[in-house]
């Protein structure tokens, strides 16, 4: 395992242990609303602090971008490295006791994704990847599914629910209608990093969502790519981290999904 990936995995494990211990005291955990329907808990903040401390100890000059703590500037040659952290992806699930959430850590070098960890503290599943070295689950090599069409495919998605996404709800429902009849099912589980990890593991055949932040997608996207899948924004370009919308899947299902949803895109998502 690459040294940077090993450091990231150890940091994710520490955060995951903190999160898992917190499940038993959900009734007393402090919850705040950052924005409409966007929650943060003391556990999110503590988990991010744990990760940042581990990364800063190993790589004090690297830049860090965390969902809760914002941007920490790097210095010297270390500024070319950027760690992208979501300490608790699926906070709403966590708050409600739904056991589907994850720690997500990605490392970029000069803007390119290099390492990724998505850790599920409940199922003790550790999804890891390094550029050019493949993706793994608990040390076992991952490959995307071999399904050749959307017929019988299982898809993952995220349902628009925030106020700034409601204007696109009808477009999303049209996408849903065009897909639900030809697939085995569509799942909306509430943690994009895990959804993408499931694509990498072949559990989902493809995934799409809009209105995401970089920390929601970065680690999961590299997992899919290193497992042999494709990832893009809704126009088919590679600017998904910048644009905040993503399509991912095995080669065949990715292309079929992209072709199916594109006619239903609002103008704001066609750019």
Swiss-Prot record:
Induction statement: Transcription is strongly induced during mouse infection.
One GO CC term, this protein: cytoplasm
Residues bound to substrate: 67, 88-91, 187, 216
Localization: Cytoplasm
Role summary: Part of the processive rRNA transcription and antitermination complex (rrnTAC). The complex forms an RNA-chaperone ring around the RNA exit tunnel of RNA polymerase (RNAP). It supports rapid transcription and antitermination of rRNA operons, cotranscriptional rRNA folding, and annealing of distal rRNA regions to allow correct ribosome biogenesis. This subunit may play a central role in organizing the structure. A ribosome-associated protein, deletion of which alters the expression of 494 genes, suggesting a role in global gene regulation. Involved in control of pathogenesis-related genes. Required for the activation of virulence factors associated with acute infections (type 3 secretion system, T3SS) while suppressing virulence factors associated with chronic infections (biofilm formation and type 6 secretion system, T6SS). It probably acts at a post-transcriptional level.
Xref: InterPro entries: IMPase, Inositol_monoP_metal-BS, Inositol_monophosphatase-like, Inositol_monophosphatase_CS, Inositol_monophosphatase_SuhB
Subunit details: Homodimer. The rRNA transcription and antitermination complex (rrnTAC) consists of RNA polymerase (RNAP), NusA, NusB, NusE (rpsJ), NusG, SubB, ribosomal protein S4, DNA and precursor rRNA; S4 is more flexible than other subunits. Interacts with the ribosome and with RNA polymerase.
EC number: 3.1.3.25
GO biological process: inositol metabolic process; phosphatidylinositol phosphate biosynthetic process; ribosome biogenesis; signal transduction; transcription antitermination
Subcellular location, principal: cytoplasm
Species whose genome carries this gene: Pseudomonas aeruginosa (strain ATCC 15692 / DSM 22644 / CIP 104116 / JCM 14847 / LMG 12228 / 1C / PRS 101 / PAO1)
Major enzyme class: hydrolase
UniProt-listed Gene3D superfamilies: 3.40.190.80, Fructose-1,6-Bisphosphatase, subunit A, domain 1
The UniProt record lists the keyword Nucleotide-binding: no
Catalyzed chemical reaction(s): a myo-inositol phosphate + H2O = myo-inositol + phosphate
Cofactor: Mg(2+)
Protein name (Swiss-Prot/TrEMBL): Nus factor SuhB
Lineage top rank: taxon: Bacteria
GO molecular function: inositol monophosphate 1-phosphatase activity; metal ion binding; RNA binding
Keywords, ordered alphabetically: Chaperone, Cytoplasm, Hydrolase, Magnesium, Metal-binding, Ribosome biogenesis, RNA-binding, Transcription, Transcription antitermination, Transcription regulation, Virulence
Family from the record: Belongs to the inositol monophosphatase superfamily.
Consequences of knocking out this gene: Decreased expression of T3SS genes and effectors. Loss of cytotoxicity against human lung cell line A549, avirulent in a mouse infection model. Down-regulation of flagellar genes and up-regulation of T6SS structural genes and effectors, increased biofilm formation. Grows less quickly at 37 degrees Celsius. Decreased susceptibility to antibiotics neomycin, streptomycin, gentamycin, spectinomycin, ciprofloxacin and ofloxacin. Increased ribosome stalling on leader peptide PA5471.1 mRNA, leads to increased expression of PA5471 and up-regulation of the MexXY efflux system.
Binding of Mg(2+), residues: 67, 86, 88
């Amino acid at each position: 395992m690459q040294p940077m990936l090993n450091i990231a995995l150890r940091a994710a494990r520490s955060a995951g242990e903190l999160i898992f211990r917190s499940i038993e005291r959900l009734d007393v955990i402090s919850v705040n609303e950052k924005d409409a329907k966007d929650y943060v808990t003391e556990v999110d903040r503590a988990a991010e602090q744990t990760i940042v401390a581990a990364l800063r100890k190993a790589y004090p000059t690297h830049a860090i971008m965390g969902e809760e703590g914002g941007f920490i500037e790097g210095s010297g040659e270390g500024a070319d490295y950027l760690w992208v952290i979501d300490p608790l992806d699926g906070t709403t699930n966590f708050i409600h006791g739904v056991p589907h959430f994850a720690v997500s850590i990605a490392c970029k070098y000069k803007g390119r994704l290099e390492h990724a960890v998505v850790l599920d503290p409940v199922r003790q599943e550790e999804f890891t990847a390094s550029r050019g070295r493949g993706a793994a689950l608990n040390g076992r090599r991952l490959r995307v599914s071999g399904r050749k069409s959307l017929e019988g495919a299982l898809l993952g998605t995220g349902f628009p629910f925030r106020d700034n996404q409601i204007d696109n709800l009808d477009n999303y429902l049209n996408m849903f209608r065009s897909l639900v009849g030809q697939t085995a099912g569509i799942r909306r589980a509430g943690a994009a990093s895990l959804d993408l990890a499931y694509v990498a593991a072949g559990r989902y055949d493809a995934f799409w969502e809009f209105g995401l932040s970089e920390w929601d997608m970065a680690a999961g996207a590299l997992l899919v790519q290193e497992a042999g899948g494709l990832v893009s924004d809704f126009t088919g370009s590679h600017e998904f981290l910048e644009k905040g919308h993503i399509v991912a899947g095995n080669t065949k299902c990715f292309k079929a999904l992209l072709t199916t949803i594109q006619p239903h895109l609002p103008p704001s998502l066609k750019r």
